[in-house]
From Swiss-Prot:
Main EC class the enzyme belongs to: hydrolase
Cofactor: Zn(2+)
Binding of Zn(2+), residues: 16, 18, 204, 285
Keyword Transcription regulation included in the entry's annotation: no
Functional note: Catalyzes the hydrolytic deamination of adenine to hypoxanthine. Plays an important role in the purine salvage pathway and in nitrogen catabolism.
A Pfam family matched in the record: A_deaminase
GO-annotated cellular components: cytosol; nucleus
GO biological process: adenine catabolic process; hypoxanthine salvage; IMP salvage
Biological source species: Candida glabrata (strain ATCC 2001 / BCRC 20586 / JCM 3761 / NBRC 0622 / NRRL Y-65 / CBS 138)
Lineage: Eukaryota, Fungi, Dikarya, Ascomycota, Saccharomycotina
Protein name as annotated: Adenine deaminase
């Protein structure tokens, strides 16, 4: 094991974080009040009760049911700004230096909140985080795969200007995985890439779905990153391909345990991925719901993989930087920061 002080100081990049998934109970209830939103009768009545319910998810769908109720309290640009700013202030104390952030506009547009409102609120928080906290960030618009692909295509058309201008830096695919394979979204990804050939592409795959979902995301959607991807372990051929192409897997340890993908963090094939030279980063996914932000994930992995030394953690940090979608100059700055922290602890 390495000292937790080292992990705290180690510069971190987060690539798998849903902004709506950072909605803590102590922000959810004030926003509901501010916007006169009536929460469902079966919904817990206090932040404390809700926090307890968040410890009891049976699977991905059980979590999603609560996640989508939570999004109902977000209505105005200010709400989205407050949500993202609360995330940035938390992680600024955890060694986070760069974040690539998912958001789900369809959770909001289906309620009559415009895509522009959502995006501008988040974008303002990203700018403030850069100016005041020194954290760089990119926004990744996700399509909800449980909605009809035609609706997803419509969302891409609505986002055309934001994609063209680069405010939306990447496209992702999330929500319930198993019933909705990548093949349903080929047209969506092709259209988005046509609007802006520089748009970065990723997709959730291989969390509850098999390794075939990962291969299909690579082959059919032309993604250059895989979100989760833990079931890639099922195929030697796929693992060799991921290693050769240095495709980043954005792994979410505490999330995988919370949603019963694995029983413990030890079961996540992180050592296998290291042995196979597959690049991965460690991320928090939906931290308000899963009881852990990025540093909590680093601490838990450190406990469950006690043989990992400074060299291994240096490699993970650098893989995260090299796999990021920030500019080369920023990558070089961050790599130098990692070197400085490693040198401090190993010299």
């Amino acid at each position: 094991m390495v000292p937790e002080s080292f992990l705290l100081e180690l510069p971190k990049c987060e690539h798998h974080l849903h902004l709506e998934g950072t909605l803590e109970p102590d922000l959810l209830f004030p926003l509901a009040k501010r916007n006169n939103i009536q929460l469902p009768d079966h919904f817990p009545q206090t932040p404390e009760e809700l926090a307890v319910r968040y410890t009891q998810f049976k699977d991905l769908q059980d979590f999603l049911d609560y996640y989508y109720i939570g999004t109902n309290v977000l209505l105005k640009e200010e709400d989205f700004f407050d949500l993202a700013w609360a995330y940035f202030t938390k992680v600024s104390k955890q060694g986070l230096v760069h974040a690539e952030l998912f958001y789900d506009p369809q959770s909001h547009t289906t309620r009559g909140v415009s895509l522009e409102t959502v995006t501008r609120g988040f974008e303002r928080a990203c700018k403030k985080a850069h100016e005041e906290l020194g954290i760089t960030s990119k926004l990744i618009m996700c399509l909800l795969r449980h909605l009809p692909p035609q609706d997803c295509l419509q969302t891409i058309e609505e986002a055309e200007q934001l994609i063209k201008s680069g405010v939306i830096h990447g496209l992702g695919l999330d929500s319930a995985e198993k019933p909705f394979p990548p093949s349903l979204f080929v047209e969506c990804y092709e259209r988005a890439a046509k609007i802006n050939p520089e748009l970065r592409l990723t997709a959730h795959a291989g969390e509850e779905g098999t390794h075939q979902f990962v291969s299909d995301a690579l082959d059919l959607l032309n993604v250059t990153r895989i979100d989760h991807g833990v079931n890639s372990k099922q195929s030697e051929e796929l693992m060799a391909r991921l290693a050769e192409q240095q495709t980043l897997l954005t792994v979410c340890p505490l999330s995988n345990v919370k949603l019963q993908v694995v029983q413990s963090v030890k079961e996540i094939p992180l050592q296998l991925f290291l042995d196979k030279n597959i690049a991965f980063s460690l991320n928090s996914d939906d931290p308000a719901y899963f009881g852990g932000y990025i540093l909590d994930n680093y601490y838990q992995v450190n406990k469950d993989f006690p043989d990992w030394d400074f060299k291994v953690w240096e490699r993970i940090a650098k893989n995260g930087i090299n796999g990021s979608w920030c500019e080369q100059k920023r990558k070089e700055e961050l790599l130098a920061k990692v070197d400085a922290v490693v040198a401090k602890y190993t010299n």
